[in-house]
Amino acid sequence: MSDNLSASQEKTPHERMQARLTVAALVQWQGRFLVVEEEIKGQRRFNQPAGHVEAGEDLLTAACRELKEETGLTATPTSWLGTYLYKPADSEATYVRTAIIFDLEKAPGQHHPEDPDGDILACHWLTLEEIAECKPALRSPLVWQCIEDYLAGTRLPLSALKAFIQS
């Protein structure tokens, strides 16, 4: 350490966060929310249909793909709910999750997930109360936060999501 710098002023290298870019689909139908039941590290977890953005995808395309893969549903994205940063205490990973609100054009039927990752156990339409009962088994606090934001009326325009993907 230089004689001119105190211990609190000593320059230290900044560690850069390595974020994992993910999307989630929030779908509500007649007072029930669509959740997927997954197996993560041998434990049952509940989540919105969600996953990683793949190379070359924009956020809306990724959210539509994840919804289709995990539930078999095709729906219309209507609003951007928000973007959330999550750093679990038990992991080195940091997640940046963009949540998109989808509207169903007709009543949901049977779910036939494509599930290329093989971790979806089932799809459920749960009330807020049922999700609250599952809180300890939610995949992350983002699941509940997205529902709270949705119920609070948060709606951002999809046109605010910009993508500049160069090949």
Q: What is each residue range found by the language model?
A:
Residues W29-E69:
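Conserved Nudix-box catalytic region and its N-terminal flanking loop in Nudix hydrolases
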Residues V53-T76, Y86-R139:
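Unchanged
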